[in-house]
């Protein structure tokens, strides 16, 4: 599918936010990165001061990967379906962390190798499991288009329902292997640079994972620079849908927090699908996966947090949400020097 042109966040609102920051009762720049975030939020909303986020929404994209049968994960493939049920029951880490951050959670089954718990979760299902990318394409061309369209449709559904900030999450045994292929292909690095320990594999598991990425990358590099073909060859329905989701959020001028390796790999593809989309995103955190740092560098995104996390699900991004809300509060609720009757150092050189 083709995405509409992405327009950048409002530069006038950004300039107004930066100017307002300099009038607040604090030394200029004293709130550090919080000030930069507030300027970004004002630009995304097109107003200064910005509104507080009231309808943050996490969407977890779930799918199985045939490469999981190559011993690339510490967990068996059936865990994906089991975790989808856990999300639905409210018992996963993302449920707990999103709850304390004030965000609601939706899970979407794109390619879990099992029947979905209900029609709502499976409404966008493309297939049961994606292909083993070491020997075959992850998807057909038609499935790739369906997955991209599904991700874009989910973004539209959430924005139309009132979401004012989106958080992208993932679940899929083997998905960091596919993600490493996407990142290595788009940043032109070798597998050993992009592959991490994922769910906690040992050295032998890392070697198997690196070999799997090597084999898939050999095939994936043949289809570059076509981002849709790359998703077909090495992505999977969940990652393709994530790419569509991230791209369409930007088209809809809705700020989005990225999570870890799988999400950011998909976002890297999304930036190729919809140039300029990255201006609507923030990196919620930096995971311990080496490929994640590569993808963030390629997107020119600075992570908000670094807590040595590697779970996925949207957990790192959910933890960043209170900081984003704090940035809004500082810009919108602090008094100016004039309002507070405090001497402004800039007025007395």
UniProtKB/Swiss-Prot annotation:
The active site is at 313 (proton acceptor). It catalyses: 5,6-dimethylbenzimidazole + nicotinate beta-D-ribonucleotide = alpha-ribazole 5'-phosphate + nicotinate + H(+). Its EC number is 2.4.2.21. Keywords: Cobalamin biosynthesis, Glycosyltransferase, Transferase. The keyword Glycosyltransferase applies. GO terms for biological process: cobalamin biosynthetic process. Pfam families: DBI_PRT. NCBIfam families: cobT_DBIPRT (TIGR03160), PRK00105.1 (NF000996). Catalyzes the synthesis of alpha-ribazole-5'-phosphate from nicotinate mononucleotide (NAMN) and 5,6-dimethylbenzimidazole (DMB). PANTHER family: NICOTINATE-NUCLEOTIDE--DIMETHYLBENZIMIDAZOLE PHOSPHORIBOSYLTRANSFERASE (PTHR43463:SF1). Belongs to the CobT family. This is Nicotinate-nucleotide--dimethylbenzimidazole phosphoribosyltransferase. It comes from Mycobacterium avium (strain 104). The lineage of its organism: Bacteria, Bacillati, Actinomycetota, Actinomycetes, Mycobacteriales.
């Amino acid at each position: 599918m083709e995405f509409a042109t992405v327009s950048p966040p409002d530069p006038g609102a950004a300039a107004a936010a930066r100017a307002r920051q300099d009038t607040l009762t604090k030394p200029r720049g004293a709130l550090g990165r919080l000030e930069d975030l507030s300027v970004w939020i004002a630009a995304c909303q097109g107003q200064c001061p910005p509104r507080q986020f009231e309808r943050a929404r996490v969407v977890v994209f779930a799918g199985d990967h045939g490469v999981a049968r190559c011993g690339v994960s510490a967990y068996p493939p059936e865990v994906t379906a089991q975790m989808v049920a856990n999300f639905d029951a409210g018992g996963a880490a993302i449920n707990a962390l999103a709850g304390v951050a004030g965000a609601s959670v939706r899970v979407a089954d794109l390619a879990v190798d099992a029947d979905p718990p209900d029609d709502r979760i499976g409404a966008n299902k493309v297939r049961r499991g994606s292909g083993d990318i070491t020997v075959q394409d992850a998807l057909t061309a038609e499935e790739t288009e369906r997955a991209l369209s599904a991700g874009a449709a989910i973004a539209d559904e959430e924005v139309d329902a009132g979401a004012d900030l989106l958080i992208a999450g993932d679940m899929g045994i083997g998905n960091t292997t596919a993600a490493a292929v996407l990142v290595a292909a788009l940043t032109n690095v070798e597998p050993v640079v992009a592959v991490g320990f994922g769910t906690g594999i040992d050295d032998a598991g890392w070697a198997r994972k690196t070999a799997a990425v090597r084999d898939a990358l050999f095939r994936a590099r043949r289809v570059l620079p076509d981002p849709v073909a790359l998703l077909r060859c090495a992505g999977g329905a969940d990652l393709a849908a994530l790419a569509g989701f991230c791209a369409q959020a930007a088209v809809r001028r809705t700020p989005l927090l990225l999570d870890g390796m799988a999400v950011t790999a998909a976002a890297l593809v999304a930036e190729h699908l919809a140039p300029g989309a990255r201006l609507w995103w923030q990196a919620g955190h930096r995971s311990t996966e080496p490929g994640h740092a590569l993808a963030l560098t390629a997107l020119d995104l600075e992570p908000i947090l670094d807590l040595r996390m590697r779970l996925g699900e949207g957990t790192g991004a959910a933890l960043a949400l209170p900081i984003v809300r704090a940035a809004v509060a500082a810009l919108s609720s602090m008094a100016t020097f004039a309002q507070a009757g405090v001497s402004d150092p800039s007025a007395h050189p």
